[in-house]
Regions:
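N-terminal glycine-rich phosphate-binding loop and ensuing alpha1 helix
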Residues: 1-27
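Active-site donor-binding loop signature of nucleotide-sugar glycosyltransferases
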Residues: 4, 46-48, 77, 123, ...
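Residue-level detector of flexible, active-site-proximal loop/helix-junction positions
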Residues: 6, 50, 79, 107, ...
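Short phosphate-binding loop-to-helix
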Residues: 24, 30-75, 79-92
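Conserved core of the sugar-phosphate nucleotidyltransferase
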Residues: 82-175
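Short, high-confidence coil segments that cap the C-terminus of an alpha-helix
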Residues: 20, 68-69, 96-100
Length: 175
C-alpha cells in the first residue's frame, strides 16, 4: 500500500494517464482480477504455469488476438513511479519486427545489483535481451560486478533500449 492505496491501483492510474490506447492487466490471480476490475481495468486471465511475465504477456496477446505489429509495453504491477514520459516514448522505439520492448540501464551500485527485487537482463552485443533473472547473472566469483544492466530506462540516452524476440518453443516460430 502507498498512502492507503494498492500499488497496482497506482500502476493502473499511471497507465491510464499515458498515451496507451488500451490497458490490459494479465494475471492468473482471481484476487488481482477482482481488485483491478474494481478500478475498471480490463483483465486477461492467463495460465498459472508461466515461467516469466513475458510468457504471460505472450499468452494475453494471443487471447486478445493482437496483431504482431501492435506495440506492447510491459508495465510491471510494481512500477507505480515509472515516469509517464518513458511509457509514452517506448512505442516509438520499437521495431516493427519486435513488438515488445524492455528498457534497461546499467546498475550504479552493488546493493541494487545484489537485490532480488531488481531484475537483471543479459543482452546480446546488438542489445537484444537474451534472458532475465532476479539473481546476479552470471555469478561473480571475484565479487566484482561490471557491466550489469537492469530493466529500466535512462531517459536521456536511448542507447540502453533492449528489444526482445519471443519464440514458440514447440515449433520455433516467432511470437
Amino acid at each position: 500500500m502507498i498512502n492507503g492505496r494498492s500499488v497496482i491501483s497506482r500502476v493502473i492510474d499511471l497507465a491510464n494517464s499515458s498515451n496507451a490506447s488500451n490497458l490490459y492487466i494479465a494475471t492468473d490471480s482471481n484476487e488481482i482480477m477482482d481488485h483491478c476490475k474494481s478500478y475498471d481495468a480490463n483483465v486477461v486471465m492467463t495460465s498459472s504455469d508461466h515461467i516469466s511475465g513475458m510468457d504471460r504477456i505472450a499468452e494475453a496477446a494471443r487471447i486478445l488476438d493482437l496483431p504482431l505489429e501492435i506495440p506492447i509495453i510491459n508495465l510491471q504491477g510494481d512500477e507505480p513511479f515509472m515516469p509517464v514520459q518513458i511509457i509514452n516514448q517506448l512505442p516509438m522505439l520499437l521495431s516493427k519486427d519486435t513488438p515488445i520492448s524492455t528498457a534497461s540501464i546499467q546498475f550504479s551500485n552493488a546493493i541494487d545489483l545484489s537485490s532480488p527485487h531488481e531484475v537483471k537482463v543479459v543482452r546480446s552485443i546488438s542489445k537484444k535481451a537474451m534472458y532475465f533473472s532476479r539473481a546476479v547473472i552470471p555469478n561473480s566469483f571475484t565479487g566484482e560486478y561490471k557491466n550489469y544492466w537492469t530493466p529500466s530506462i535512462d531517459f536521456e540516452s536511448n542507447d540502453y533500449i533492449s528489444e526482445q524476440i519471443f519464440y514458440n518453443s514447440k515449433d520455433d516460430t516467432k511470437i
